[in-house]
Amino acid sequence: YCADLGVLIAGDMVLPRITTNVSVQAVEPDANPLRWFMDSLAVHATLPADTLVLPSHGLPFHGLRERVRYLRNHHKQRLEELVQACATPKSAADVLPLLFRRKLDERETRIAMGEALAHMHELYYDGRLRRYRDEQGVWRYTKT
């Protein structure tokens, strides 16, 4: 962020039309990237209202605070939906239809799995879900 110019080079952090891919990666299988993302959004929310945002995808835009508010609410809503869905044990694959309400191709499914895990990890580390490995070795998450 350049205060003198009122410009934020946002990269993928804040995109104008789609949500950022926040995923658990194979190199950090126990990471909590959604927490890091939400913490970063909180910082972005403090920037001036007239900030010009330069995203890595899409056109430059104004309205950073509104976009950050939307993104935070979007993820909070998804987290609440996941807690309710995990009244019975679920794997990350089980919750894909809840998080992604359209048919996903193979590539999109791989990306979506990382995002599903990021949401499950946030709830697990926040104490709202517990997890265990089932007899096939798959992590199952259930409401605490």
What are the residue ranges of the model-derived segments?
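Metallo-beta-lactamase
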Residues: Y1-L79
